[in-house]
Curated annotation (Swiss-Prot):
Keywords: Cytoplasm, DNA-binding. One of its GO terms (molecular function) is DNA binding. It comes from Enterobacter sp. (strain 638). This is Nucleoid-associated protein Ent638_0951. The keyword DNA-binding applies.
Length: 110
């Protein structure tokens, strides 16, 4: 059942190493900042790995325009930044688990 490369002991060691790598990756993700854009870069929103908004930049030309449009652009820029953080998190976590010899069909929780 647990044959090959060290049996259960080897699997436990792999799991511990993976846990350490995941913790390091999560710490790195928390430090990340990404910027999402909308309106061809007229609105930019920067968020960190915890999805907290760090900065909002609005091109001065938009301040003369429709308030509803500006609100929509800010929301779209935030959503773009959140999508980028999510993609980065998935990439980092996938790289952590890439060396593990997992059973067929095993799904990681990320």
């Amino acid at each position: 059942m647990f044959g090959g490369k060290g049996g259960l002991g080897g699997l436990m060691k792999q799991a511990q190493q993976m846990q350490e790598k995941m913790q390091k990756a999560q710490e790195e993700i928390a430090q990340l900042e990404v910027t999402g854009e909308s309106g061809a870069g007229l609105v930019k929103v920067t968020i960190n790995g915890a999805h907290n908004c760090r900065r909002v930049e609005i091109d001065p030309s938009l301040l003369e325009d429709d308030k509803d449009m500006l609100e929509d652009l800010v929301a779209a820029a935030f959503n773009d930044a959140a999508r980028r953080i999510d993609e980065t998190q998935k990439e980092k976590m996938a790289s952590v688990s890439s060396g593990m010899q997992l059973p067929p069909g095993f799904k990681m929780p990320f």
